[in-house]
Amino acid sequence: GEALNGEVYNKLLQNTGLAMHEGYGQSESTVIVGNFGDMEVKPGSMGKPAPCYDVDIVDVNGNSCPAGETGELVIRVDKEHPYGLFAGYYKDVSLTAEAFDSGVYHTGDTVYMDDDGYIWFVGRKDDIIKSAGYRISPFEVESVLQQHPAVMECAVTGVEDKKRGQAVKATIVLS
């Protein structure tokens, strides 16, 4: 699945009157973060951590990030391995060791938490476009493009560029 863009959420709400309760999980887990029960939904956010997971957002050095700072979403497993999180990759010890490092499971997804404890998806660690020294998240560019009334859908990718390393390419379906 893909992260739910705030603009898509608002269009659904406007057209149907229904609030969508987004959740985030991986093939390796159950729902890690979500808009559960009667909690207020913040359009575009993934929600708050599920109580069964010890979720943290860490920088490249493994330090917890303050609210508003982007880092990698991890699950701490040093005290207890939560039910619903896989034990490892089948017959792939090295990939398992990479995913479970120093008592944490690395999701590979970058996020930030706001002051209210809601988590917002930024992108994949391996999905970043590097152009002229800048690190660009395709999801962030897609979110901005999606706000334009003439854009129905879009996808952003990096393409080879001799001067910049990569250039940002947007494929757009017009309304």
Regions from the PLM with identified roles:
Residues 1-42, 54, 61-64:
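Gly/Ser/Thr-rich phosphate-binding loop
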Residues 44-49, 99-103:
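Short Gly/Pro-enriched turn/cap motifs at secondary-structure boundaries
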Residues 59-61, 70, 115-116, 150:
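Residue-level recognition of short loop/turn positions
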Residues 58-59, 67, 107, 113, ...:
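Hydrophobic alpha-helical segments, especially N-terminal targeting/anchoring helices
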Residues 49-52, 63-98, 136:
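Conserved ATP/PPi-binding loop(s) of AMP-dependent carboxylate-activating enzymes
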Residues 10, 44, 94, 143:
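Active-site phosphate/pyrophosphate- and oxyanion-stabilizing loops and adjacent acidic/basic residues
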Residues 17, 52, 150-153:
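Glycine-centered tight turns that cap/initiate beta-strands
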Residues 25, 77, 81, 95, ...:
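AMP-binding/adenylate-forming catalytic core of the ANL superfamily
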